[in-house]
């Protein structure tokens, strides 16, 4: 090597794909989330996709399943936001929800104890619809692992100022969705939904 080298066609195809300009528009998130309109969310954020990959070994260990990552999605809930009861799509076969942090100081001086306020995620562990459900409280750094396509889950109206939550989704390679949903139809992690095949 004489101080420099030239390499040709070494960039991943996704970097020169015609969809690439859309990446810049999508990478900063949106307020167009259909589940919770006017609330900030971001699909495939590079930092969260790194967390998704980083958590893979632990997820395999805790579930005993041959998992592959599908996608990450994070949301910044605000006062009054509600997550309706639902089950997830096939790319969310094995899901996690991780509490990144929250601000409840807007509750100071109210009847409820704002310092102890947790916003639970409710799960219906029977897998059926419209049963009472079980609340699971989370502090920053806590994570819930659940079967997103089987377990109905929801959140009641949020009372605090804001609450950041990331969802990390995986599929069981040996399960009903197999390899079909790996990377949620994208060529690899770290890309926005415009790259889905």
Locate the predicted segments by residue.
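A short coil-to-beta-strand element that immediately follows conserved catalytic motifs
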Residues: 64-73
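C-terminal helix/juxtamembrane-tail motif
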Residues: 185-197
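Catalytic core of non-heme Fe(II) oxygenases with the double-stranded beta-helix
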Residues: 79-150, 154, 162-166, 172-187
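Conserved active-site beta-strand element of glycosyltransferases/polysaccharide synthases
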Residues: 76
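Non-heme Fe(II)/2-oxoglutarate
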Residues: 1-63
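Short helix-capping and hinge/turn segments at secondary-structure transitions, especially at repeat
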Residues: 60, 64-65, 101-105
């Amino acid at each position: 090597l004489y101080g420099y080298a030239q390499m040709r066609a070494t960039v991943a195809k996704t970097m020169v794909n015609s969809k690439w300009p859309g990446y810049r528009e999508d990478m900063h998130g949106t307020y167009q989330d259909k589940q919770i309109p006017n609330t900030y969310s971001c699909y495939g954020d590079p930092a969260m996709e790194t967390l998704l990959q980083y958590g893979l070994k632990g997820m395999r260990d805790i579930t005993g399943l041959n998992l592959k990552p599908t996608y990450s999605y994070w949301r910044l809930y605000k006062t009054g936001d509600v997550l309706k009861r639902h089950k997830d799509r096939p790319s969310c076969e094995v899901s996690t929800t991780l509490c990144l942090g929250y601000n409840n100081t807007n509750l100071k001086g109210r009847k409820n104890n704002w310092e102890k306020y947790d916003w639970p995620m409710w799960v219906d562990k029977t897998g059926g619809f419209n049963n009472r459900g079980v609340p699971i409280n989370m502090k920053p750094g806590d994570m819930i692992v659940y079967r997103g396509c089987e377990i109905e889950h929801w959140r009641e109206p949020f009372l605090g100022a804001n609450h950041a939550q990331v969802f990390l989704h995986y599929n069981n390679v040996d399960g009903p969705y197999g390899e079909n949903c790996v990377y949620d139809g994208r060529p690899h992690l770290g890309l926005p939904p415009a790259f889905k095949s």
